[in-house]
Each structure stands twice: as structure tokens, then as C-alpha cells.
Amino acid sequence: MEDIEKIKPYVRSFSKALDELKPEIEKLTSKSLDEQLLLLSDERAKLELINRYAYVLSSLMFANMKVLGVKDMSPILGELKRVKSYMDKAKQYDNRITKSNEKSQAEQEKAKNIISNVLDGNKNQFEPSISRSNFQGKHTKFENDELAESTTTKIIDSTDHIRKASSKKSKRLDKVGKKKGGKK
């Protein structure tokens, strides 16, 4: 008796699910598949309807086999796998079409912008790949002017000192050369 009480919620849930499924099945089977296909003009919609039919039939067959306690479910599982692969292929096709449409729309927008820029005379709207700042010179400004002045003064002083020393040296050499020349 305890086992029956444990199963009752599952049976109620299953019964509720069947009640929800019944109107959907009636909607699918109200007209034959051929009649429904004739009403549709779009090939993609026809593919969707056929895939839905195959999935519903395979799923119902699977549920029926489970209820009957059939052990070998491989044929129906193979059929469900095949239907799923068809549904996946349809989804991939939709994704490709969407990407293709987005790409062509982006190309059209780009062409439209280029044509409008040329016609409007905005030829210089596109910037060069190298920034103009790369063609400008760099000017370094010294922060400490006193340091620069003292460095300049030191350089000038040392240059003057070197000149004086070299002129003294050349005068001495001249004197030595005259003395040697005078002894001859």
C-alpha cells in the first residue's frame, strides 16, 4: 500500500502532461500532413513542419515503448537521433543565412558611406594610418634654466682656458724654435 501512495503523484503528473499534450496533437492532426504542406508557401516553414511531425511521432513512440516495458529501444533512439540531426542542420542553415544577410547589409552600408562621402566632397574624411603627430618635431624644454646656464658657462670657461693654454704652448715653441734657429 505504501508503494501505491508514492506512485500516485507521478500518475497525476503524467495524466496532467497528457491532458496538455492532447490539444497540441489535435492541432497537428486536424489536417493531413499533405494539406498542411500545401498551405505553406515558404520552404523553410515546410521543413519546420516536417521536422516537428517526425519529432512528435518518434517521441510518442518512445513513450509508448517505455510504458509497454520494451527492452530494446535502439531503433526508436536511432530515429530520434536522426530527427535531431535534421533539426540541427536546419538551425545551422538559419544561422548561415542570418550571417550572410548581416554581412551583405554591412557591405551595403559601407558602400553607401563611401559613395556618399565621394559625392559630398568629403574625400579627406578618412585619416591616414599614421598620425600627424608622428611628423611633427619634438622639442625638449629644460626644466632648470640655472643648470643649463651654469653648464654653458663651464663649457665656455673651459674652452677659453684650453685656448689660453694652447696659445701659451705655441708661444713657447716659437721661442724655442727661434733660439735653436739663432744658434745656427
Swiss-Prot record:
Domain of life of the native organism: Eukaryota
Region spans: Disordered: 157-184
Keyword Zinc: no
GO molecular function, one term: protein-containing complex binding
InterPro entries in UniProt: Exosome-assoc_fac/DNA_repair, Sas10/Utp3/C1D
CC annotations in GO: exosome (RNase complex); nucleolus; nucleus
Compartment(s): Nucleus
Keywords noted in UniProt: Exosome, Nucleus, RNA-binding, rRNA processing
Biased amino acid composition, Basic residues: 164-184
GO BP annotation list: exonucleolytic trimming to generate mature 3'-end of 5.8S rRNA from tricistronic rRNA transcript (SSU-rRNA, 5.8S rRNA, LSU-rRNA); maturation of 5.8S rRNA; nuclear mRNA surveillance; nuclear polyadenylation-dependent CUT catabolic process; nuclear polyadenylation-dependent rRNA catabolic process; poly(A)-dependent snoRNA 3'-end processing; post-transcriptional tethering of RNA polymerase II gene DNA at nuclear periphery; regulation of gene expression
Positions in coiled-coil regions: none
Keyword Transmembrane helix found: no
Function of the molecule: Required for exosome-dependent processing of pre-rRNA and small nucleolar RNA (snRNA) precursors. Involved in processing of 35S pre-rRNA at the A0, A1 and A2 sites. Required for activity of RRP6 in 7S pre-rRNA processing. Also has a role in 3'-processing of U4 and U5 small nuclear RNAs (snRNAs). Acts as a mRNA export factor. Mediates mRNA degradation upon UV irradiation. Maintains genome integrity where it is involved in both non-homologous end joining (NHEJ) and homologous recombination pathway repair of double strand DNA breaks. During NHEJ, required for joining 3'-overhanging ends.
Quaternary structure annotation from Swiss-Prot or TrEMBL: Associates with nuclear form of the RNA exosome complex. Interacts with RRP4, RRP6, RRP45 and RRP46.
Protein family (similarity comment): Belongs to the C1D family.
UniProt xrefs under PANTHER family: NUCLEAR NUCLEIC ACID-BINDING PROTEIN C1D, SUN-COR STEROID HORMONE RECEPTOR CO-REPRESSOR
UniProt-recorded name of the protein: Exosome complex protein LRP1
Lineage: Eukaryota, Fungi, Dikarya, Ascomycota, Saccharomycotina
Gene name for this UniProt entry: LRP1
